[in-house]
Amino acid sequence: MMKLISEELLDSVSHEARESSRLRMNYNFHESLDSPIHRLLNALEPGTYLPPHRHTDKEETYVVLRGSLLTFFYDDLGNVIEKVNLNPSAGVYGVEIPSGTWHSIIALEPGTVIFEIKSGPYKPLPPEDIAPWAPAPSDLEGAAAVSYTHLR
C-alpha cells in the first residue's frame, strides 16, 4: 500500500509532538522494529532534547521536510567540531551522518519535521553510544543548559 507524506500527516505528527512531554514524535513507515530499513517522520518542537549519541554500526540520514534544525557533531570529548543548519528555505535540506559519529539536533522552529532513514533492526543504544559527557534526558536543567549554550 502506498504511503503518502502530506501536509495533513505532517500537521498530525507535529500536533502529537506538541502534546508529548518529550516534545517529539515519530511516525514509522517501516512495518516493524525488525525491518531492515527504518524510514520515519520525526516531528520535533523547540525544547526537545536528544542527547548526543552515535550509531557505531549504521549511517543515519535526515531530510528536513518542514521547519529547520541545527545538527551538531562532536569529538570524543564532547567538543562541537561542526554545526550544520538544516533549513530548506536556505537551500540546505539534509545530512547523512557517518556511523560512529557523535551527533545531536535542536529544532529551531515549531512544527519542524524530518524524514529519517537508517538501517534496522531497532536496537536500543548501548550505554557506550550515549555521550557520557552530556546530560541525561531526565536532567531537564542540564539539557536546557546544553541547548542554550549550543544556540548562542
Describe each PLM feature range.
Residues 123-144:
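C-terminal end-helix/capping segment
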Residues 57-74:
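Glycine- and acidic-residue-biased ligand/ion/polar-headgroup-sensing regions
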Residues 49-51, 58, 70, 91-95, ...:
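Histidine-centered metal-chelating micro-motifs
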Residues 77-99:
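Short acidic-glycine-tyrosine-enriched beta hairpin
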Residues 110-126:
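A short hydrophobic beta-strand segment most commonly corresponding to one strand
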Residues 18-52, 58:
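A short glycine-rich, His/Asp/Glu-containing loop-to-beta-strand
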Residues 149-152:
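Conserved small/polar residues in nucleotide/adenosyl-binding loops
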Residues 1-20:
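N-terminal leader/capping segments at the start of a protein or of a new domain
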